[in-house]
Design a protein with these regions (language model features):
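Flexible "cap/lid" loop of the alpha/beta hydrolase fold
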Residues: 9-53
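C-terminal alpha-helix
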Residues: 165-173
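Catalytic histidine-centered segment of alpha/beta-hydrolase-like enzymes
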Residues: 147-163
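Glycosyltransferase donor-binding loop in the core domain
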Residues: 48, 124, 151-154
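Core-facing hydrophobic residues within beta-strands of well-ordered domains
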Residues: 18-20, 139-142, 150
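Conserved alpha/beta-hydrolase catalytic His-Asp/Glu region
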Residues: 33, 49-108
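Conserved alpha/beta-hydrolase "nucleophile elbow" surrounding the catalytic nucleophile
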Residues: 1-2
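Conserved serine/cysteine hydrolase catalytic core
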Residues: 81-138, 143-146
Length: 174
């Protein structure tokens, strides 16, 4: 999902014999994506520490309003660690977040040789429909699925549809 998808396809390109199929979830190969830049700007502006787990959950709810309380709690627990006194801190390296560069990966995208599934939430601003279609056209063994009812976090917002899509792809790769 997201930047992890970029990492996955780079691994698939550099180690083609080790990857039998690939899923890319709501991310594109573009170097400059205004929505991605906006998301990172919001992450930069966030505090490193939060008063409580509930405060983290509320922050996540603001980003992902369609996610269930259970999903948000799970995410908050695994994305933060508890400090003495009950405060929470993100499990992230701020220096990496600030140094993150988004290279153009279209050339690498075209080198993917394994069956690939592109999954996009129709309400996502991060992976636009026109870019997803171009991604589908650039490589041979690929399928594009666009799911209704969610944005960038649709695997949480519409987890049943996402799971069905994953199972379908794994059973019938292109």
């Amino acid at each position: 999902h997201s930047a992890g998808g970029r990492n996955a396809w780079m691994y698939a390109v550099t180690h083609p014999g080790k990857v039998s199929s690939l899923m890319v979830v709501d991310i594109d190969p573009d170097a400059d994506n205004p929505e991605s830049r906006s998301m990172f700007e919001r992450y930069h502006a966030e505090p490193d520490e939060w008063e409580s787990l509930e405060a983290v959950i509320e922050r996540l709810r603001g980003r992902q309003p369609a996610s269930t309380d259970e999903m948000l709690r799970h995410q908050a627990l695994h994305m933060t660690r508890e400090l003495p006194g009950g405060r929470r801190v993100w499990k992230r390296d701020r220096a990496l977040l600030e140094a993150y560069e988004r290279p153009d990966l279209w050339e690498e995208w075209r080198r993917i040789s394994c069956p690939t599934l592109i999954v996009r939430g129709r309400q996502s601003d991060l992976l636009r429909h026109d870019v997803a279609v171009r991604m589908r056209e650039e490589i041979k063994r690929v399928r594009l699925v666009e799911l209704d009812g969610g944005g960038h976090w649709f695997y949480q917002e519409q987890h049943g549809a996402f799971e069905t899509t994953v199972r379908w792809f794994l059973q019938r790769p292109p």
